[in-house]
């Protein structure tokens, strides 16, 4: 379980997050949404251990987070892939740094690529891939170390609408298959409502938790209902419009 208690953090010398209290249980998909500048990415960077926080605590499985660790896998919008390495070697890179034997890490990379639908693309280079394929590689790399927690920072923001829909459904299938804790940062309201088992709305900066909404649309999808059916459901549309109104309230307050 991820547990965040009374978290305060600065960014660029200014308060970015204020008294954040959150929990994320195993098998849950928590989505954090809010207006630009609300501290969404700062929150992810704190959980990843990339930056320090000023007050409070972040614990994963009862252990305080004070730096990066293999128990947390991170996927970024810009993927962060190595262009001079092929797809398989990119996925296996973290395992190589961890000292995993070559044949074992290549087999793990092969299995992860199979999970994300890129079996057969092992020897291709990053520049030969589409945006959606590069994000699949990024997800495969994050899963390769078998982390307890998967962190994703607006991973589908630069993709076209069709590819974004494909990646959303892929992530939900991987979430169901692996049972991992997942925390997703997004600025896309429809994506947030569709994918969250719990949606956290942050205020304008410094970010505070405005509201926590338990949702069941992601579970309906993994139970077999189509994404198109879910997104055209009046319940989904009503929730999307409610969340949109809450985000607009914060944008207007900030301006």
Swiss-Prot record:
GO molecular function, one term: ATP binding
GO biological process: cellular response to sulfur starvation; taurine transmembrane transport
One Pfam match: ABC_tran
UniProt keyword annotation of Membrane present: yes
Top enzyme category: translocase
EC numbers on record: 7.6.2.7
Quaternary structure, from the entry: The complex is composed of two ATP-binding proteins (TauB), two transmembrane proteins (TauC) and a solute-binding protein (TauA).
Identification of the protein by name: Taurine import ATP-binding protein TauB
Upper taxonomic lineage: Bacteria, Pseudomonadati, Pseudomonadota, Gammaproteobacteria, Enterobacterales
């Amino acid at each position: 379980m991820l547990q965040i208690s009374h978290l305060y953090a600065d960014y660029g010398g200014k308060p970015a997050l204020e008294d954040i209290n959150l929990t994320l249980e195993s098998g849950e998909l928590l989505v954090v949404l809010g207006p630009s500048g609300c501290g969404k990415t700062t929150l992810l960077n704190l959980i990843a251990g990339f930056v320090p926080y000023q007050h409070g605590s972040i614990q994963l499985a009862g252990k305080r987070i004070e730096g990066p660790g293999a128990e947390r896998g991170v996927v970024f919008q810009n993927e962060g892939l190595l262009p001079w390495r092929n797809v398989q070697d990119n996925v296996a890179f973290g395992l190589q740094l961890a000292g995993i034997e070559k044949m074992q890490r290549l087999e793990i990379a092969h299995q992860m690529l199979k999970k994300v639908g890129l079996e057969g693309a092992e020897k291709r280079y990053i520049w030969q891939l589409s945006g959606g394929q590069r994000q699949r590689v990024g997800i495969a790399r994050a899963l390769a170390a078998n982390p307890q927690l998967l962190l994703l920072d607006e991973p589908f923001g630069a993709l076209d609408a069709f590819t974004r829909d494909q990646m959303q459904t892929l992530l939900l299938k991987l979430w169901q298959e692996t049972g991992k804790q997942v925390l997703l940062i997004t600025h896309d309201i429809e994506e947030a409502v569709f994918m969250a088992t719990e949606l956290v709305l942050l205020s304008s900066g410094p970010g505070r938790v405005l509201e926590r909404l338990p949702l069941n649309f992601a579970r309906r999808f993994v139970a077999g209902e189509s994404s198109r059916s879910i997104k055209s459901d009046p319940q989904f549309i009503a929730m999307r419009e409610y969340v949109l109104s809450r985000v607009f309230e914060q944008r207007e307050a900030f301006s």
